[in-house]
Amino acid sequence: MCIRDSHKVIKANNFKGNYIHYGVREHAMCAVMNGIALHSNLKPYGGTFLIFSDYCKPAIRLAALMKIGVIFVLSHDSIGLGEDGPTHQPVEQLSGLRSIPNLNVFRPADTTEVAECWQIALQNNQTPSVIALTRQRVSPIRKQFTEQNYCESGAYEIMRTGNDIKCTILASGSEVGLAIEVGHKLATRNIYSKVISVPCLDIFEKNSEEIKSKILDETNIIFSIEAAKTDSWGKYVGKKGKSFGVDDFGKSAPYKEIFNDFNLKGDEISNSISGIIND
């Protein structure tokens, strides 16, 4: 899944290539990449579905422990996978990967964030990276490229709907677009918010308390939106806020229907936030 036209496949009788067909061998793939990184100055990367990171976990953990900058590209990162159903829809995997010390778990929102997260991963030689990507198409969140890498702080403000801010909405990946939709819906009720894209919680946590507090604006009620288990966000939303996510196994259906079944839709979330703020 990571192959390009410029790549040449390594074969039994020809080792001059730069691409390995591992087959359905996720653990072996990640372990081999660790070996390549330890043996040379090469920067290996390989890909599989996020759900299969469970097969890769020992090798990913060792990459973090050994401080080598391997890049693990993990696609189909949520219930957005759709009809393949709960066996292939990751729910708890992001939380598990985020719990590994010295591992950066990136979940970019669009192509611009993908490029920025990729740059960070390439430049980091002592911390391995997971780059979690969607299956479904997502609309561009940032329409213009800038020299500044906004993802390098782990989280940044991507929208605010007014001056009298009542809440902060955190989101990652494909749900950043949903958070923006929720922000606009709340604004029609005179509830103004700021939306924070959080491509990497691990990097965000390394900021000073002052910077984290400034980004979160902890004087507001904080909410989070992510199509995965919500336990990554509890420390931020606290008792006043709420996390919108997926705390059960998924379902087999078109992805939009599954998002609706888990109430991950603009109207439902904006109604819930409005009720909490006006309570």
Model-assigned labels for residue ranges:
Residues 4-279, ...:
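Thiamine diphosphate
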